[in-house]
């Protein structure tokens, strides 16, 4: 019986070796098979694993299991993934920056590699309490939209201030878009408080007071024409104390030239400037009419015969008729009387005419002192009136008369 037991034990050891080498699954290791004799084979299998393996058995160590293979595969995938996740380099394109006539200016611009997927990933990583607003409603976009609205409002307000042609010019920013800035020319008003004081001082002059009181229809001196006088004072560049009565009428005459251009109303300026001598100014366009009435009727009759006498000059010299020679001798007398009549005119009338000529010359010099800029914009006139809106001069409005 002892021999048979030893034989069965040896056979069980051999069969245990074969089963453990061919079935390396961990479930078999945890539940070792029992031999036919009923004894466990766990200790025998552990002792045999350390020795040389039988033929046909895989000699790979237990660390080369499926878990190791999966680890190697995962490491290989992790090495390949960074190559796929690298952000593509931004591409470069050429875009049109400016088109002027037939010339086109190009500039190089990079294309942004940011996609909507990146915004979605960013929003998914935000905290639960943060509002994942869409990318086009970000803070930068909102600030840009607010800035653009403010720039459009400023653009609507600025052109109203730019219309006035004023002496000095400066450059101001009209629009700022990104890194581009558009400049425009703007004139600065030179109307100072000194010019308003000089104008108010001249209003106290008795002649100017009488003139403004006479112009009840406001044909020559309404509020806009008087505001142009202040604008001309500022453009002429004279000191405030140097402006006198003549400068007031010069500026007013020039303002009527620009706006009204009514000769009859402008002649009234001479009437008040040179007192009542305007009625005595000679009418040089009708000198022959005055001379004809002042001549002797016989002389006027002989004067009508002058062309006939000139044609028959040769006959007159030979003619013995004394009446014809007597009429010819009166022709120089008519010329002398015409010269005497011209000198017998009122000396004040001739003086007033010379004053009118001098007035026109001074008006031209005053116009040149303003750099030949006589046009005044409505915006500048309103600005001048806004300096002292309660002044009695600004109540001279033609709209109130109708």
UniProtKB/Swiss-Prot annotation:
This is Speedy protein E2. PANTHER family: WBSCR19-LIKE PROTEIN. Pfam families: Spy1. InterPro entries: Speedy (IPR020984). Residues 1-89 are annotated as: Disordered. One of its GO terms (molecular function) is protein kinase binding. Residues 16-39 have a biased composition (Polar residues). It comes from Homo sapiens (Human). Disulfide bonds: none annotated.
């Amino acid at each position: 019986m002892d021999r048979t037991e030893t034989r069965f034990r040896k056979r069980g050891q051999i069969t245990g070796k074969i089963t453990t080498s061919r079935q390396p699954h961990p479930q078999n290791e945890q539940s070792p098979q029992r031999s036919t004799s009923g004894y466990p084979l766990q200790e025998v299998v552990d002792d045999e694993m350390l020795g040389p393996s039988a033929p046909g058995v895989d000699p790979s160590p237990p660390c080369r299991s499926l878990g190791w293979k999966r680890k190697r595969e995962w490491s290989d995938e992790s090495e390949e993934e960074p190559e796929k996740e690298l952000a593509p380099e931004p591409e470069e394109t050429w875009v049109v920056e400016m088109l002027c006539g037939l010339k086109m200016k190009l500039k190089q611009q990079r294309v942004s590699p940011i996609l909507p997927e990146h915004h979605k990933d960013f929003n998914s990583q935000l905290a639960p309490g943060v509002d994942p607003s869409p990318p086009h409603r970000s803070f930068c976009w909102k600030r840009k939209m607010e800035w653009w609205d403010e720039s459009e409002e400023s653009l609507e307000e600025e052109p109203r201030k730019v219309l006035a042609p004023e002496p000095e010019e400066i450059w101001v920013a009209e629009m700022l878009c990104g890194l581009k800035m558009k400049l425009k020319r703007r004139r600065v008003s030179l109307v100072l408080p000194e010019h308003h004081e000089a104008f108010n001082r001249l209003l106290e002059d008795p002649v100017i007071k009488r003139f403004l009181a006479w112009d009840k229809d406001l044909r020559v001196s309404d509020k806009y024409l008087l505001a142009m006088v202040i604008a001309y004072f500022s453009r002429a560049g004279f000191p405030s104390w140097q402006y006198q009565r003549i400068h007031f009428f010069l500026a007013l005459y020039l303002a009527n030239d620009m706006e009204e251009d009514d000769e009859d109303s402008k002649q009234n300026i001479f009437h008040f400037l040179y007192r009542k001598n305007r009625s005595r100014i000679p009418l040089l366009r009708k000198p022959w009419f005055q001379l004809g009435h002042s001549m002797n009727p016989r002389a006027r009759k002989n004067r009508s015969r002058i062309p006939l006498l000139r044609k028959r000059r040769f006959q007159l010299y030979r003619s013995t008729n004394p009446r014809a020679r007597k009429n010819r001798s009166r022709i120089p007398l008519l010329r002398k009387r015409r010269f005497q009549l011209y000198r017998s005119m009122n000396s004040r009338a001739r003086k007033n005419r010379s004053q009118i000529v001098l007035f026109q010359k001074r008006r031209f010099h005053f116009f040149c002192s303003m750099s030949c800029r006589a046009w005044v914009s409505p915006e500048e006139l309103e600005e001048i009136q806004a300096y002292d809106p309660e002044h009695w001069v600004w109540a001279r409005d033609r709209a109130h008369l109708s």
